[in-house]
Curated annotation (Swiss-Prot):
GO terms for biological process: adenylate cyclase-activating G protein-coupled cAMP receptor signaling pathway; intracellular signal transduction. Residues 141-167, 291-300 have a biased composition (Low complexity). Keywords: Cytoplasm, Cytoskeleton, Repeat. Interacts with lis1. It comes from Dictyostelium discoideum (Social amoeba). The gene is dcx. Residues 115-167, 282-308 are annotated as: Disordered. The keyword NAD does not apply. This is Protein doublecortin. The keyword Cytoplasm applies.
Amino acid sequence: MTSTSGKPKMEKFGLQTDKSARVILFRNGDRYHVEGVHCLVHSSKFKTFDQLKLEFSKKVGLFTGNVQKVYSMDKKRIQDIKDFVDGHHYICCGAEPLNTEVIPKGIQDIFGKAEVSDQDDEPKPSKPFVSSVPPPPTPTPTSSSGTTTTSQPTLSASPSVSSAQSPKKPVVSAYKESAVHSIDKFSVQTEKAKVIMCFRNGDRYHSGERVTVHSTKFKTYDQLKEQLSKQVKLPTGPVRKLYLASSGKLVKTMEEIIDGEYYVCAGGETLNPLDFSPTLSEHVKQKKLQEQQQQASEQQKPQEQEIF
């Protein structure tokens, strides 16, 4: 008996056949958003498009409010959950229109173009099954008598001959190297975490935020700046610059961060050392005194050597 409905066979029994879509979201008008936010979209988890936009608001964190509109790379507005495609990139907007001039760095190469979906769902042709068991012997009738004899299958080569033709490979020990190198090979190399204090630029009443920096927690410098934006909460927007408070040097990579130091977080504005908080000003004074003492001690050493 054949079914007349147009649904797939699996949907008759109440099984979910829709695939989830993994999408990458970017903030509208944020040119420093590089990696994007990964999110999983499925119709069983989000019943309506409004529920999905609330989830986007929590993950993306727009500076203009909640996510109200979502656009694809070809500038088309998404109207339903079914419009999302697995592996594609999207821009989240609030009440403001789509900013086509300031484009996030992560999608500058593909913005304005239609993305090509991966054709990984096509069924691949299955390989024919080849049995490793030899076929059974076939009976061969004889002309002189009525009895039948079975022909034994002939082997291509005996085990002794095959072993003589293929020489044995030498066994290489995994512990042939030195003891020190073998210990380093199996040991887990871990870096020490760096604990720093971060302050708002131009806010003399900010007491600072304690941030732990580790390579396993933050893979890139942009991820660290996103975490600083959540903790420090600059009134001018996200954290785009990080300055060393004692010298005013701009930090360009995560490797330049020093454990136990004080840093100033800024947006697009420049560093304002006149509005440092009392805690930050005291730290800068102590650092300058330590540097002066080190310079004085280094100058005294050559003089003592000349005397002796």
